[in-house]
Amino acid sequence: MWPAPTAAPVEEPTRPTVQAVLCVSDHPNPPGAARCRICSDVIAAQPARDVPLPVLALLRASNGHVAEVDRPVLIGRSPSPDRSDAADPELLTVTSPSHDISRTHLEVAPSGWDLVLTDLHSTNGTVLVTPDGKTRQLDPGEAVVVPLGTAIELADGVSVLVDYPQ
């Protein structure tokens, strides 16, 4: 009898790492942080260490859909993973009754501890509303770092909030 064939091991994609300091509840935070970004506890002085990239934000679409940002997230009315350089991007589908939102409208991706939003040459553009209420129209293809609390206005009355992780 021949031995049964074995399947080739499936390689899990490796998650990127970041330098971090941990609070007493082991939440990862950017080096130099005084308080935890999750629980607000004081962070004791400590050397930074490499940790897997944590969830940096939650994207809350006005249709109720939510995506975690721990890898690139493509947002649109029918987002296609082909529009990202990432091996396995998250897809966040939003409604667009008038088809004013592009199929793959924009990408929100982690870059270290930053969140980089890129308009993917959308037809009707992307408007950002920062936490202090300032608005900014992105140019097609423009990439910007966005803070937590930013609202992303797409079209058709659809918006996405860049919210704090839980």
Q: Which residues fall in each region the model found?
A:
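Intrinsically disordered, low-complexity acidic Ser/Thr-rich regulatory segments
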Residues: 1-97, 147-148, 158-166
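Short polybasic amphipathic segments
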Residues: 55-60, 125-128, 152
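Forkhead-associated
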Residues: 71-148, 155, 163
